Amino acid sequence: MALWGGRFTQAADQRFKQFNDSLRFDYRLAEQDIVGSVAWSKALVTVGVLTADEQRQLEEALNVLLEEVRANPQQILQSDAEDIHSWVEGKLIDKVGQLGKKLHTGRSRNDQVATDLKLWCKETVRELLTANRLLQSALVETAQVNQDAVMPGYTHLQRAQPVTFAHWCLAYVEMLARDESRLQDTLKRLDVSPLGCGALAGTAYEIDREQLAGWLGFASATRNSLDSVSDRDHVLELLSDAAIGMVHLSRFAEDLIFFNSGEAGFVELSDRVTSGSSLMPQKKNPDALELIRGKCGRVQGALTGMMMTLKGLPLAYNKDMQEDKEGLFDALDTWLDCLHMAALVLDGIQVKRPRCQEAAQQGYANATELADYLVAKGVPFREAHHIVGEAVVEAIRQGKPLEALPLADLQKFSRVIGDDVYPILSLQSCLDKRAAKGGVSPQQVAQAIDDARARLAL
């Protein structure tokens, strides 16, 4: 049953109906629609539209419907209803008869769907926050047991300076902490209820919208009805949060794909998150990580698509806004799945310390230490930089690391270099010297782990 048939003398073309209907995806808002309807029934009592007994009958029927939906949400898709609002109203009328037709008094699908979607977003944000913190915790635990795993750090995918696997893990903890903060910030802005704004001009009934918002668990009610029914900022913000979060997960995946490769060999992934080849029996492919990396693109696409949908819309509601849900649902589902999968990847990962150490000792990652040593001897940094570059060329020519060059060879480039240079060039010295806050020194890494554990209550 359509909710708008009285104005029309012809039935909708079946092709238009299929094009127009949204039940196939907005069925996911069933629980929120029912919860919102219960609250609206209470509001109608306060303005005399419903008696207390009528409201009780409606609430009881809606609660029964809620349990039926929770038991089998797929039943909704067997209906020919236009959207979830039509489906809920139809089911309610089946249960309570003509009384069910009174529930929509003073309410529009415009404020109804805006409310449903915000309720869904609030619940989903809480799920995302939980998954985000679980991944942060997994990274912290992985860092805890790999504080002594020295590996090369990279710039331009070239070995740059030695770091530890723990320090690498903590870098992603920081990214995820920002993702968490963004979600919490978004939650504050979407925590306002549009219910009671009607189609665009507000409801004709003197409903206490602040009280209504409180019944639904919102912090407050919105302030302008035109804006309220056409506002999809929270959709854009959540898609933006998801896009940024997925970029972080994609980088995480790319790093581990490289670390797991035969060329690097720094880690080995668990059999539980890898797959084989149908042709090459030796292969162990990092499919979980590659899928995380690949799924990043669809989330970016959802954000771009929603921005383009909204950019030219006049106030207030337009049917274009029906396009807000599929992209949002898919993007947040994808982000949530990838957060869980990233945590699973860390569960069982093996860090190959000898190979990491070997790689850290290659590539002249201690060259900066030699430059700093020269600066400490009074050589201007720019000159020291040039001297070390020449020393690296000589080391490459001899096929040796810097610390293996004889003192006489080093002194060809600067007479200030003495025997005391060799301890400075050790990997441990390279790490120990980075002792400022945020650095890779063992003390700073241990402190960062302690701070993260305290924040996450581990």
UniProtKB/Swiss-Prot annotation:
What is one process in the GO biological process aspect for this record? L-arginine biosynthetic process
Q: Which SUPFAM superfamilies match?
A: L-aspartase-like
Task: Identify the main location.
Answer: cytoplasm
The EC category is: lyase
Pathway, according to UniProt?
Amino-acid biosynthesis; L-arginine biosynthesis; L-arginine from L-ornithine and carbamoyl phosphate: step 3/3
Q: Which Gene3D superfamilies match?
A: Fumarase/aspartase (C-terminal domain) (1.10.40.30), Fumarase/aspartase (Central domain) (1.20.200.10), Fumarase/aspartase (N-terminal domain) (1.10.275.10)
Location relative to the cell: Cytoplasm
Q: What is its EC number?
A: 4.3.2.1
Q: From the UniProt record, which GO molecular function terms apply?
A: argininosuccinate lyase activity
Please state which protein family the record places this protein in: Belongs to the lyase 1 family. Argininosuccinate lyase subfamily.
Q: What is the recorded name of this protein? A: Argininosuccinate lyase
Q: What is the native source organism of this protein?
A: Salmonella paratyphi A (strain AKU_12601)
Gene name as annotated: argH
